[in-house]
């Protein structure tokens, strides 16, 4: 219980509390304590909620009984600015979509430059003091500030862009990137002239092994001989240069550009003998579609239908391509036949007739993980901590990571539960 309190409150702050204040703090985090005690503390919501039924008998007998708000003020708190982060700019596009779709009903405002441990708590608090009814914090690093704000303001809906965070006071959201990776893996193998392709992964957090495996399975579907060479951006060295030294020319890089890498070294691309990069395909987030769906749920009174309510589990939205939130951008330079293949796979995933993991799968150590008669559950996919035998590489442990990657691993790493607690447990 104390660990949960320390996640929500700063330890120095708790030391100053009177017994009554400490009891109130425990009461505020109690739902989160209950969630942590459950075998499955996080409930994955894999589909948008069904629209609320109107004109029901209850509506006719007691008009106005529903709790739909007539107006919402929605705040977005970003770790960085749109000018310095493509990730933030993508969420900004999503915010402006809300303004367009719900003109007159929804007002949005953005706060940039929220730094955890510095001004993040203050910016989230400012958003609420400025009248926000709903707050989206768009980085996993802001989950601590989100949780603390939710405990101070239980009537404000607060959502953090992350996965598998066991806090019932907030909701979290992300997308099933592995579906897009399955398609880009097939594209990579189709255009590669050799039987090896490269894959750059960020940090071994929840969902990342599934992305790697889905990419490898998509590639192997096109070329059964293909091997996926895995490099990590969270480890020392230059992954792209390492691939070039191995003669690998088709690479799955970072999912979004960064100021520190050339803009074309993202998504899946091919390097020509002369060093020219050709874009092939890239996962793409339609954040506006996600925000529109969630806000519409609030406006039609259906927010509580997504919440587990009485069982006290945390809610994590984890939507895929069939929701419109996730997609794949195909390059104009992609060969026609390969584009046709990608569109077939996309249509199959959206329709549910193609499941990247509904096939025979062997792990690197030879263990048969799936005999192919069925797929995996969403929880099994999100919590994968193994690599299939088409992958050359490993999942690094915490001690191998560069210092800049360790905070993210502590929050969302696949083996975060094995790590000793930090002295100051402030998120």
Model feature map: region roles:
Residues 2-12:
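Short helix/strand-capping connector loops at secondary-structure junctions
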Residues 12-427:
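A residue-level marker of the well-folded mature domains of exported/periplasmic proteins
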